[in-house]
From Swiss-Prot:
Described purpose of this protein according to its UniProt entry: Ferredoxins are iron-sulfur proteins that transfer electrons in a wide variety of metabolic reactions.
Coiled coil: none
All residue ranges annotated as the 4Fe-4S ferredoxin-type domain in the record: 2-30, 31-60
Residues binding [4Fe-4S] cluster, per UniProt: C21, C40, C43, C46
Keyword annotations: 3Fe-4S, 4Fe-4S, Electron transport, Iron, Iron-sulfur, Metal-binding, Repeat, Transport
GO molecular function: 3 iron, 4 sulfur cluster binding; 4 iron, 4 sulfur cluster binding; electron transfer activity; metal ion binding
Cofactor or coenzyme needed: [4Fe-4S] cluster; [3Fe-4S] cluster
UniProt: [3Fe-4S] cluster binding residues: C9, C17, C50
Gene3D superfamilies: 3.30.70.20
Matches recorded under PANTHER family: FERREDOXIN, OXIDOREDUCTASE
Protein's recorded name: Ferredoxin
InterPro entries according to UniProt: 4Fe4S_Fe-S-bd (IPR017896), 4Fe4S_Fe_S_CS (IPR017900), 7Fe_ferredoxin (IPR000813), Fd_C (IPR022569), FdxA (IPR054829), RnfB_subfamily (IPR050294)
Keyword 4Fe-4S listed: yes
Length: 109
């Protein structure tokens, strides 16, 4: 099992979670973060540090997010992130929007 970053992170990219991760398993794209499922130790330390509740435990309904994370890291060159950065501009405006992955990531690729 692993933890996954979900749709809530898109266009917000708060990075509070990355500094508490004991194994540095977060990776960064232009609009969101992902957790490398091969590196995550399932400790859950990052969950309470996400201000928008974007980090969830792996479950059957979230398996597509695990696969997306692997794809972004392996095939799109997303880089490891270990230090907190400022959230994306306008993050507060986007934090409650739904279906952001399809609107901003799928549309862009």
């Amino acid at each position: 099992m692993t933890y996954v970053v979900t749709d809530e992170c898109v266009k917000c990219k708060y990075t509070d979670c990355v500094e508490v991760c004991p194994v540095d398993c977060f990776y960064e794209g232009e609009f969101m973060l992902v957790i490398n499922p091969d590196e995550c130790i399932d400790c859950g330390v990052c969950v309470p540090d996400c201000p928008i509740d974007a980090i969830k435990p792996e479950s059957p309904e979230l398996i597509e997010w695990v696969e997306r994370a692997k794809d972004f890291i392996e095939n799109h060159g997303w880089k490891n992130i270990t230090k907190k950065k400022c959230a994306l501009p306008g993050a507060d405006k986007f934090k409650d929007e739904k279906d952001k992955f399809n609107k901003y990531i799928i549309k862009k690729t």
